[in-house]
Amino acid sequence: MIRRRPEKYIDVTLFVRMIFLTLVLVLSTLTAPAQQTSSNAQPSPSPDSSTAKQPDPRDPVERSDEFKSKLTFGIYFIPGERAYDLNLRHQFGQWTAWIAGFYDPKSNKLLRVGAQYDYKKGWLHLVPTLEVSTTRAMSGSLYSELGSGKTYAIAGIARTNLRPFFDLFWDPGDSVQLGIGHKISNYDRIQGYTIFDVRLHTEQQNTHVLWRHKLNANNGITLDAVFKSGHGDSGKFIRTAGIGVYYDREKWFWKLYFDPHVNFADHTMVRAGIGLKF
């Protein structure tokens, strides 16, 4: 979300250099040195004396979630303005970390870093997340899925320090989340949940209905319908709806969202993005 308040931002040139240097450092750590081949290597065992590796029966798009790194570039359009966001994230076992830069030529410029931990045991799935930015903004959340079968409950809570912030979720930041999900197959699933404000007394709530579906072996799609209600900054009560599309390939993706009254403001935002998985 974007909340505009007077802040001292970093210089644009320094902002660009920080992003570039960070990308170089992160990408360099992902490249492992080639292993040397021993001159005294023993002959490989025959097929009769070893178990051959079984081929993965899943389709390429079903394996796409297993890539450890993701680089996303987004452009956000509102009337008379355009903003840009670059996000690099990498998974380290159960931990995921990211660094991102947001640039609005007319106002906001900031960097943000974050991390989350993915814990699964039996019927319990917990994902705590923490993110901080160069505007001294902080955001923390705890997401959970409860259930051992195909159908599960969704519950979560999020909190910020109310400083100027920008994130990629576009829902109330100081909120509680409640919902339900159902796994149709290894890839397909449907979810419905509501995220509602519990701190600022705005009565803001966003209800999402998500449907993820495999089109064929190499393509998948997620549709995200959102229904909004609540008071905006002006006090006006808003009721509206938006839609998003996420198109998934094995090693890349694109997404497009139409978001009227973004963050319960008076204007509409269109968000477009493209990314790589590696």
Residue ranges and their predicted role:
Residues 35-110, 272-274:
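Outer-membrane beta-barrel initiation region
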Residues 224-229, 233-244:
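An anionic, turn-rich surface loop/hairpin at beta-sheet edges
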